[in-house]
Regions:
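Short amphipathic alpha-helices in soluble, non-transmembrane regions
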Residues: 66-73, 197-206
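Alpha-helical transmembrane segments
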Residues: 15, 25-52, 64, 252
Length: 259
């Protein structure tokens, strides 16, 4: 009763209490907000954007062997060109994963969209850029970017900025890199197919440099992000302890004054 009476009686006391509790609450909300903001990142990335189950990159000379192996499965696949290269604009440059696919074949394997609408897969010398990369390069739809193909700078017009939560990506058309043979495959798991066995079979082919199974990649990232839970717990505990200290001190002051 004394604490409540003094809070309403003395404006400074009320301000102290409100600021103290408000600050503690803000700290707690921040901690929980951080956790909530990253909780669904992997779901968005691998359930709504990248829809395939595995991918492989290989030397172009091994393309026939890889496709022959994949043809013997029940699941589907598409091939394209993928490489890490420098992407530049008038505002700077960044390294990014560049993926070149046939626009029609990409459906069902990649879903390019922003928060408002679907973004058509680019054709000709068009490009769709992932959101974080676009922000860092200072580009938006209608701007020009340049990709460095082994020393040759090739210009593309940005037709869209898509949502993306893991790494940087630039999507371009297969026809714009027609001189480069396919060096990547994106694979859908067939009915009753063991995707791990498929991955092992791909790794056994000469010239295959990397095989990624989305399930494994997702598990690794979930494990690395689990440390965020400990940070949230620490922040919430400190916020609660600080709120207790604030209320305890204010109550003590009020009781002492009453005595």
């Amino acid at each position: 009763k004394v604490t409540i009476r003094n809070a309403f009686r003395y404006k400074k006391r009320m301000v102290m209490m409100l600021l103290g509790i408000g600050g503690c609450t803000a700290l707690m909300v921040t901690g929980l907000g951080i956790r909530d903001s990253v909780a669904h990142i992997l779901d968005y990335q691998y359930d709504e954007i990248m829809l395939y189950d595995a991918s492989a990159t290989y030397d172009s000379d091994s393309a026939d062997s890889v496709e022959e192996f994949l043809d013997d499965r029940s699941g589907g696949y598409i091939t394209g060109y993928q490489d890490t290269m420098t992407v530049s604009s008038g505002s700077g440059e960044k390294d990014a994963n560049v993926i070149a696919l046939n626009a029609q074949e990409s459906e069902g394997y990649f879903d390019l969209h922003d928060s408002k609408e679907e973004i058509p897969y680019p054709t000709g010398y068009e490009a769709v850029v992932s959101s974080k990369l676009a922000s860092q390069l200072g580009v938006s739809a209608g701007d020009r970017i340049f990709l460095n193909f082994d020393g040759d700078s090739v210009g593309y017009t940005v037709t869209g900025v898509c949502d993306n939560f893991v790494n940087h990506y630039v999507y371009i058309s297969e026809e714009s890199v027609s001189d480069d043979a396919p060096n990547a495959a994106y694979i859908m798991q067939g009915e009753q197919e063991d995707i791990q066995a498929t991955a092992a079979g791909l790794r056994a082919i000469d010239g295959v440099s990397y095989v990624s199974v989305i399930e494994q990649e997702r598990a690794l990232m979930e494990n690395s992000m689990s440390s965020m839970d400990y940070i949230v717990v620490v922040v919430v505990l400190f916020a609660g302890a600080l709120a207790f200290v604030v209320l305890y001190n204010l109550t003590n002051i009020n009781i002492i004054e009453r005595m």
